[in-house]
């Protein structure tokens, strides 16, 4: 039988007492009073911060949004089906943040920056707060470099600059996403990092966009943040801020970024749902009182940084959906007042076959020609004026029976200019091709052609210049100006191609 030695036991106890480390750990906890509809009411959690992350017993994470006298309103970042009344909740002491790194390029992630493309985990050594303060006044400089979208109508008349916020607004099915995705495709080789945020979209639509990017090699420089229609409202509300945090990471590293929020109407609806369930007082259109702040703090994060901070930029293209063309609704007017201009897409133009369906009359860029190269400024001024006069004349001509020759000529020119602005989807043009196209139209070279020949001729002209007059593109890309030499080369090419084209058509 084994003997118990008291001295050995007392020695072990003494050693344990000496090695005892006194540590007091205070955990801020509470209990669930009520849970449902993505909202939980918690009793306790006395020292929780607004916006702090809280963790439920079964692992679900939530954000404390409502701090009331006797309970805390928490929005859940998951379905919360396993949370029970009376289960415990602890405050984490952290505000929502996500990991950030170069490894995110080419990946599809959710609002918590977790990959959802089935290609394994993403390693990141750094993290950023989802809600970061926007750069201050002294940290910015005015927008002066163009961000080419590849769409003639935008680059010529509603130019977008690096660091600008330009709203894309229009009814459903008017090509808003197409304008945004074409802009991403056009950034190939421009050293611009793109972030596409899909909020409350159909999963099939997001898959289509991702496939399009992959086929055209755009995923190499793009990050897709997706929260589909079946995601909890909390995650749909957070997705744009996650996208902005990723874009900021690159902006502060002296890179240029482009971020697309598709679309902010859905984010506002998700926020409205959360606010109403938290019993916050409803305002206009049942949106909460701080819905303006929801979007302003997001869009103010887009900036062109000063030279001291490395001149990085973040250009934002938010998308807002209107109902029956009503731009005076609550969310559209809010976002219009925050952004530096808007591109208005019209259902009538879309149905009339004018695509991209941009209504040039009420679209505007508040940065203007500061975001254009000199060559574009030179040819585009005339285009906008002629199109405005044409729109006025066209409305008047509907009621007039006999028009004089000058008016007929002006109408014919306007129709041809409108034709040259049409572009197929996913076929962006370089700035040199745009300058060439606009010059051909505004200087009357298309007037002798039939309307249905215009686009065919322009496609052939662009190919002809590329192969036979490469010096034209070299001059514009190197000097950024439309020199006399470039003009002479272009005139020569237009005439040579016109002769060939007319002979082909006759044959």
Swiss-Prot record:
One of its GO terms (molecular function) is ADP binding. InterPro entries: ATP_synth_asu-like_sf (IPR023366), ATP_synth_asu_C (IPR000793), ATP_synth_asu_C_sf (IPR038376), ATP_synth_F1_a_nt-bd_dom (IPR033732), ATP_synth_F1_asu (IPR005294), ATPase_a/bsu_AS (IPR020003), ATPase_F1/V1/A1_a/bsu_N (IPR004100), ATPase_F1/V1/A1_a/bsu_N_sf (IPR036121). Keywords: ATP synthesis, ATP-binding, CF(1), Chloroplast, Hydrogen ion transport, Ion transport, Membrane, Nucleotide-binding, Plastid, Thylakoid, Translocase, Transport. Disulfide bonds: none annotated. One of its GO terms (cellular component) is proton-transporting ATP synthase complex. It catalyses: ATP + H2O + 4 H(+)(in) = ADP + phosphate + 5 H(+)(out). The record marks 363 as: Required for activity. ATP binds at residues 170-177. It is found in: Plastid, Chloroplast thylakoid membrane. Its main location: plastid. Its EC number is 7.1.2.2. PROSITE patterns: ATPASE_ALPHA_BETA. Belongs to the ATPase alpha/beta chains family. F-type ATPases have 2 components, CF(1) - the catalytic core - and CF(0) - the membrane proton channel. CF(1) has five subunits: alpha(3), beta(3), gamma(1), delta(1), epsilon(1). CF(0) has four main subunits: a, b, b' and c. NCBIfam families: atpA (TIGR00962), PRK13343.1 (NF009884). HAMAP family: ATP_synth_alpha_bact (MF_01346). This is ATP synthase subunit alpha, chloroplastic. The lineage of its organism: Eukaryota, Viridiplantae, Streptophyta, Embryophyta, Tracheophyta.
């Amino acid at each position: 039988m084994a003997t118990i030695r008291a001295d050995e036991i007392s020695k072990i106890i003494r050693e344990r007492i000496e090695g005892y480390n006194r540590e007091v750990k205070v955990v801020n906890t509470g209990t669930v009073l009520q849970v449902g509809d993505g909202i939980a009411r918690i009793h306790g959690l006395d020292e929780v911060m607004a916006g702090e992350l809280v963790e439920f017993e079964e692992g679900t994470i939530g954000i404390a949004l409502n701090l009331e006298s006797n309970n805390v309103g928490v929005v859940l970042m998951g379905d919360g089906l396993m949370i029970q009344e009376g289960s415990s909740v602890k405050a984490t002491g952290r505000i929502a943040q996500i990991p950030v790194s170069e490894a995110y390029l080419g990946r599809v992630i959710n609002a918590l920056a977790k990959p959802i493309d089935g290609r394994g985990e993403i390693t990141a050594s750094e993290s950023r707060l989802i809600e970061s303060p926007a750069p201050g006044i002294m940290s910015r400089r005015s927008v002066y470099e163009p961000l080419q979208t590849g769409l003639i109508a935008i680059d010529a008349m509603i130019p977008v600059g690096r660091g600008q916020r330009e709203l894309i607004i229009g009814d459903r099915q008017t090509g808003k996403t197409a304008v945004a995705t074409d802009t991403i495709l056009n950034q190939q080789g421009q050293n611009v990092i793109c972030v596409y945020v899909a909020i409350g979209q159909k999963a099939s639509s997001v898959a289509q966009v991702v496939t399009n990017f992959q086929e055209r090699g755009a995923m190499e420089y793009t990050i897709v943040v997706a929260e589909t229609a079946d995601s909890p409202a909390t995650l749909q509300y957070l997705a744009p801020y996650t996208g902005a945090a990723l874009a900021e990471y690159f902006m502060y590293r002296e890179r240029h970024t482009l971020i697309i929020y598709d679309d902010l109407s859905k984010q506002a609806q998700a926020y409205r749902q959360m606010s109403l369930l938290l019993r916050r007082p409803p305002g206009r259109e049942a949106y909460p009182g701080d819905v303006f702040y929801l979007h302003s703090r997001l869009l103010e994060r887009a900036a062109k940084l000063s030279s001291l901070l490395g001149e990085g930029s973040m250009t934002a293209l938010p998308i807002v959906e209107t109902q029956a063309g009503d731009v005076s609704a609550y969310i559209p007017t809010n976002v219009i007042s925050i952004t530096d201009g808007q591109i208005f897409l019209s259902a009538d133009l879309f149905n009339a076959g004018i695509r991209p369906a941009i209504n040039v009359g009420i679209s505007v860029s508040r940065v203007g020609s500061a975001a254009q190269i000199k060559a574009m400024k030179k040819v585009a001024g005339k285009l906008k004026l002629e199109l405005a006069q044409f729109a006025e004349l066209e409305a008047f001509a509907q009621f007039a029976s006999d028009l004089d020759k000058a008016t007929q000529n002006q109408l014919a020119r306007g129709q041809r200019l409108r034709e040259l602005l049409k572009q197929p989807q996913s076929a962006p043009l370089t700035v040199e091709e745009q300058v060439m196209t606009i010059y051909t139209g505004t200087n009357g070279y298309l007037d002798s052609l039939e309307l249905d020949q215009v686009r065919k001729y322009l496609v052939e002209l662009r190919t002809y210049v590329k192969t036979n007059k490469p010096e034209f593109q070299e001059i514009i890309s190197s000097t950024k100006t439309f020199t006399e030499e470039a003009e002479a080369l272009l005139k020569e090419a237009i005439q040579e191609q016109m002769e060939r084209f007319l002979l082909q058509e006759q044959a």
